[in-house]
Curated annotation (Swiss-Prot):
It catalyses: allantoate + H2O = (S)-ureidoglycolate + urea. NCBIfam families: allantoicase. This is Probable allantoicase. Pathway: Nitrogen metabolism; (S)-allantoin degradation; (S)-ureidoglycolate from allantoate (aminidohydrolase route): step 1/1. Its EC number is 3.5.3.4. It comes from Photobacterium profundum (strain SS9). The lineage of its organism: Bacteria, Pseudomonadati, Pseudomonadota, Gammaproteobacteria, Vibrionales. Keywords: Hydrolase, Purine metabolism. Pfam families: Allantoicase. InterPro entries: Allantoicase (IPR005164), Allantoicase_dom (IPR015908), Galactose-bd-like_sf (IPR008979). Signal peptide: none annotated. The gene is alc. Belongs to the allantoicase family. One of its GO terms (biological process) is allantoin catabolic process. GO terms for molecular function: allantoicase activity. HAMAP family: Allantoicase (MF_00813).
Length: 330
């Protein structure tokens, strides 16, 4: 029996926003390989056709009339360990592959070649049409590329590769300031009160948000209380500066925010939600403004090394990015 896995607590290493790219496919006659890893969920366009037939939101090969099978190679945006996979056949009904498997390799200095050694990380699995196929993995190796094999042909809407980025913290000096929460540094959004309009993981992404959808936004709160999100830092460290970016949030930014933090030892990711109610105050409540980058330094309390933070927003609304600058601890 496969272990249970909360996929939302991991990073999609195959996200184009992190630099991932579908670099090769044996055939993508009906639907371009680049669509296999699009950030957005797959969609159906009823009356859209192109020169090769029905437009499909995913990767689709032509009907195979010879021996063999099709595959697509994806360069991950961030090298890392892979905890789970989602092979998504949304809207592929009469044209999905009967089965698929996934291989991975470590090729940090360039693209894989004919001599590259691939390792099977998911054996051949039966697929259903218009379905998500979630598979938890137990593998601690670091990979840079994955290869989706489909037997013998057909279409897959999306491939999600959930894992943890591999960060060489030895290359970061003890006196070098770094964003401890950034996804590229291993930061992960673990839990939140609500993410009706935008996913919690967006606040740790690179750069500024592209639009309002590229942030974390909650539904309008109609009951007492406030919304919150919990973040695991990529490395324990001392936080000295907080940056809250409300880019594109103009009529729906939070009135204010505060941050709690703790050095969590032991337990699981799922247990921190209850613990977070009692964490110490890293930053007392601060007013926020629309479509603005706000930096807080003097307002940040010295808590020493911490591993997790809880961002509280009052009462609800949207945040584009959260940056937690500090120094790694030994």
């Amino acid at each position: 029996m496969e272990k249970a896995l909360n996929f939302e607590q991991y990073v999609n290493l195959a996200d184009p926003k992190l630099g991932a790219e579908a670099i090769f496919a044996t055939d993508d006659f009906f639907a371009d390989k680049s669509r296999l890893i699009r950030t957005e969920a797959a969609e159906w366009k009823e009356d859209l056709y192109d020169d090769n037939g029905k437009w499909m939101d995913g990767w689709e090969s032509r009907r195979k009339r010879s021996e063999g099978y099709d595959f697509c190679v994806v360069r991950l945006g961030l090298a890392g360990t892979i905890a789970g996979l989602d092979i998504d056949t949304s809207f592929f009904t009469g044209n999905f592959p009967p089965s698929a498997s996934v291989d991975a390799c470590y090729s940090p200095d360039g693209e894989p070649s004919d001599s590259t050694e691939w390792q099977e990380i998911l054996s051949s699995q039966s697929l259903q049409g218009d379905s998500h196929h979630l598979h938890a993995l137990d593998n601690e190796q670091v990979f840079t590329h994955v290869r989706l094999n489909i037997y013998p042909d057909g279409g897959v809407a999306r491939l999600r590769v959930y894992g943890r980025p591999s960060v060489n913290w030895d290359q970061i000096g003890i006196d070098q300031e770094v964003d401890l929460a950034a996804v590229v540094n291993g930061g992960r959004a673990l839990a939140c009160s609500d993410e009706h309009f935008g996913k919690k993981s967006n606040i740790l992404g690179p750069g500024r948000g592209e639009n309002m959808g590229d942030g974390w936004e909650t539904a309008r709160r109609r009951t007492p209380g406030n919304d919150w999100v919990i973040v695991a830092l990529g490395r324990p460290g001392k936080i000295g500066k907080v940056v809250v970016d409300t880019a594109h949030f103009k009529g729906n930014f939070p009135d204010s925010c505060s941050i709690q933090a703790a050095y969590v030892q032991g337990g699981t990711d799922d247990q921190v939600e209850t613990q977070s109610l009692f964490w110490r105050e890293l930053m007392p409540s601060q007013k926020l403004s629309a479509h603005n980058i706000q930096e807080f330094v003097e307002q940040v309390n010295d808590l020493g090394a911490v591993t997790h933070v809880r961002l509280n927003i009052f009462p609800d609304g949207g945040i584009s990015r959260l940056r937690l600058f500090g120094f790694k601890s030994e």
